[in-house]
C-alpha cells in the first residue's frame, strides 16, 4: 500500500539534493521518495494549513512537535541529544522508531525545530497571523538532512533555497539550517514592523493636517473622526502583539545559540574538526538575535509614539469638549438676551415710531392726532436702508462659499476646455502651410480656412 503518498497533504512540495550544479530538483509531493532514500538530502515545503490536512500526516513527527502544528503558539525551539562512549550529538526522539507511519530515525539522528509567530498588519482592520516553522532531521554519521518547512509562500520558498548554507555546512552542522531559516523570518518581522510604522505615521501626519484651516468638513470626514479612537486602539493592540512576538523570537534565538554552545561543550573534539563552520553558524544566529533585539527596541519606541498620539488626541478632544460646553453656555446666554429683546422690541418700535415728528398729539381741541403729509419719507428711507443692511450681511456671511463655488466652476470649465482642445488636436491633421499657399492666400486666390474649437 502506498501509505505515505496517500497521506501526503496537497500543499507538499519536495526537493532533493542531486549534487549537480543545479543543486536541488523538484520531486513532486510523493512522500515515498523520502522514505525510500533517507541517505539523501530533502527539503519539504508544506504550504497548506496543516489543520486541514490528514491527521495521520502529523504522526510522522514527534509528539512534542505536534502542538507546534496544531496549537496557536508564539514561538518554540527544541533539540534532542544522543550520546555514546566517545561523543555527544543531537539525536532523534526514541519514539520516532515506534510509530509505523513515521520516518525511521536511527539513534544517531538529530531532530530539532524552531517556530516563530508573525502578525502582518495592512490596516487597523486588515491583518493576518503567520506561524512559520522548520523541522530538521539530521544524521550524525552521514550528515544527510530531511527538512520540513511550514508556512512559506512560493516567494519565501525561493528565497530560502537561495539562502541555504553550503553542503559542507549542512553536513556537519544542522544549526546552519536554523540560521538560514531565522534570517528569512527576521526579514518578515522587519517588514511587519514597517507596516505598523506606516500606520502610526499616517495618523501623525493626518493630525498635522487637521491643524491647518480648511473647508467645512464633509459628512464622511465627520464619520471618520468619530471612528478615529477605535482605529487608534486597534493599532495599539497590533503593536502589543508585535512586541510580544518579537520578544519571544529574540528568546528563541537566544536558546538556539545556547544549544549550539552546549553541543560544542559536550562534543568538543568533533566540533573542533569543523570549528570554522561552527563559528560561522553561531555568528549568523547571533546576528539574527541582534536584529531581533533591535526590532524589539524600535517596537517599544513605536508603541510609545502611538500612545503619545492617543494621549494627544484625547487632550484635543477634552479641549474641544470644553470649548463646546463654553459655546453652549454662551449660546444659552445669547438666546436669553435675544428672547428678552424680542419681548421689548415691538413696543420699542411702536413707541419710537409714534415719538417721531411725523406724529403730533394735540390736547386742545379734543385730544386729536396729527400726522404729517410727508410720512411716506420714513418708509422711503427705512426700507432701502434695511435691504442694504441685509445685503451687506449676506455678502459678508456667504463670501467664502461663493468664492469657493466660483473657483470650482472655473476649474471645471478649464478642465473641460483642456479636454476639448486635446480631442480637437488629436482629430486635426493639418497639411503643410508652404510658401505657395501663402501667395495664393495673399492674392485672395485661396480662401483662408479656419478651424474653431468650441
Curated annotation (Swiss-Prot):
Region (Disordered): 205-224
GO molecular function list: metal ion transmembrane transporter activity
GO cellular component, one term: membrane
Positions with biased composition (Basic residues): 205-219
Localisation: Membrane
Keywords: Glycoprotein, Membrane, Transmembrane, Transmembrane helix
Statement: the UniProt record of this protein carries the keyword RNA-binding: no
Highest taxon listed in the record's lineage: Eukaryota
InterPro entries in the cross-refs: CorA_TM1_TM2 (IPR045863), MgTranspt_CorA/ZnTranspt_ZntB (IPR002523)
Topological relation to the membrane, as annotated: Multi-pass membrane protein
Positions of transmembrane segments: 334-354, 375-395
Pfam families tied to this protein: CorA
Applied value in biotechnology: Notoamides have been shown to exhibit antitumoral activities. Notoamides A-C show moderate cytotoxicity against HeLa and L1210 cells with IC(50) values in the range of 22-52 mg/ml, but the IC(50) value of notoamide D is greater than 100 mg/ml. Moreover, notoamide C induces G2/M-cell cycle arrest at a concentration of 6.3 mg/ml.
Glycosylation sites: 51, 74
UniProt keyword Acetylation, yes or no: no
Free-text function comment from the UniProt entry: Part of the gene cluster that mediates the biosynthesis of notoamide, a fungal indole alkaloid that belongs to a family of natural products containing a characteristic bicyclo[2.2.2]diazaoctane core. The first step of notoamide biosynthesis involves coupling of L-proline and L-tryptophan by the bimodular NRPS notE', to produce cyclo-L-tryptophan-L-proline called brevianamide F.
Protein name in UniProt: Notoamide biosynthesis cluster protein M'
Gene: notM'
Amino acid at each position: 500500500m502506498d501509505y505515505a503518498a496517500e497521506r501526503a497533504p496537497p500543499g507538499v512540495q519536495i526537493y532533493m539534493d542531486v549534487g549537480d550544479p543545479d543543486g536541488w530538483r523538484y520531486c513532486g509531493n510523493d512522500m515515498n521518495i523520502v522514505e525510500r532514500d533517507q541517505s539523501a538530502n530533502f527539503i519539504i515545503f508544506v504550504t497548506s494549513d496543516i489543520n486541514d490536512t490528514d491527521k495521520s500526516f502529523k504522526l510522522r513527527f514527534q509528539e512534542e512537535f505536534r502542538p507546534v502544528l496544531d496549537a496557536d503558539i508564539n514561538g518554540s525551539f527544541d533539540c534532542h541529544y544522543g550520546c555514546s562512549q566517545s561523543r555527544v550529538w543531537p539525536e532523534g526522539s526514541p519514539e520516532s522508531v515506534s510509530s509505523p507511519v513515521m520516518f525511521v530515525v536511527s539513534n544517531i539522528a538529530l531532530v530539532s525545530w524552531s517556530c516563530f509567530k508573525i502578525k502582518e498588519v495592512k490596516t487597523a482592520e486588515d491583518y493576518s497571523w503567520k506561524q512559520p516553522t522548520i523541522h530538521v532531521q539530521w544524521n550524525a554519521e552521514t550528515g544527510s538532512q530531511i527538512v520540513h518547512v511550514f508556512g512559506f509562500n512560493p516567494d519565501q520558498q525561493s528565497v530560502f533555497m537561495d539562502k541555504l548554507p553550503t553542503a559542507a555546512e549542512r553536513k556537519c552542522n544542522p544549526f546552519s539550517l536554523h540560521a538560514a531559516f531565522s534570517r528569512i523570518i527576521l526579514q518578515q518581522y522587519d517588514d511587519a514592523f514597517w507596516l505598523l510604522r506606516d500606520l502610526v505615521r499616517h495618523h501623525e501626519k493626518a493630525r498635522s493636517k487637521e491643524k491647518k484651516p480648511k473647508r467645512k468638513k464633509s459628512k464622511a470626514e465627520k464619520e471618520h473622526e468619530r471612528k478615529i479612537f477605535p482605529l487608534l486602539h486597534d493599532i495599539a493592540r497590533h503593536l502589543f502583539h508585535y512586541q510580544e512576538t518579537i520578544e519571544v523570537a529574540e528568546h528563541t534565538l537566544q536558546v538556539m545559540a545556547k544549544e549550539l554552545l552546549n553541543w560544542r561543550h559536550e562534543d568538543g573534539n568533533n566540533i573542533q574538526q569543523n570549528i570554522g563552520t561552527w563559528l560561522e553558524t553561531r555568528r549568523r544566529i547571533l546576528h539574527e538575535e541582534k536584529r531581533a533585539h533591535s526590532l524589539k527596541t524600535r517596537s517599544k519606541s513605536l508603541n510609545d509614539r502611538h500612545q503619545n498620539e492617543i494621549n494627544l488626541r484625547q487632550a484635543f478632544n477634552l479641549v474641544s469638549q470644553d470649548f463646546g460646553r463654553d459655546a453652549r453656555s454662551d449660546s444659552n446666554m445669547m438666546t436669553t438676551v435675544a428672547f428678552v429683546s424680542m419681548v421689548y422690541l415691538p413696543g420699542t418700535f411702536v413707541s419710537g415710531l409714534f415719538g417721531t415728528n411725523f406724529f403730533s398729539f394735540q390736547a386742545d381741541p379734543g385730544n386729536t392726532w396729527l400726522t404729517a403729509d410727508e410720512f411716506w419719507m420714513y418708509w422711503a428711507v427705512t426700507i432701502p436702508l434695511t435691504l442694504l443692511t441685509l445685503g451687506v450681511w449676506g455678502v459678508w456671511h456667504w463670501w467664502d462659499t461663493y468664492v469657493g463655488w466660483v473657483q470650482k466652476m472655473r476649474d471645471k470649465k478649464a478642465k473641460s476646455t483642456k479636454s476639448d482642445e486635446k480631442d480637437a488636436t488629436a482629430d486635426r491633421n493639418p497639411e503643410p502651410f508652404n510658401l505657395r499657399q501663402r501667395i495664393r492666400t495673399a492674392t485672395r486666390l485661396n480662401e483662408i480656412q479656419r478651424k474653431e474649437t468650441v
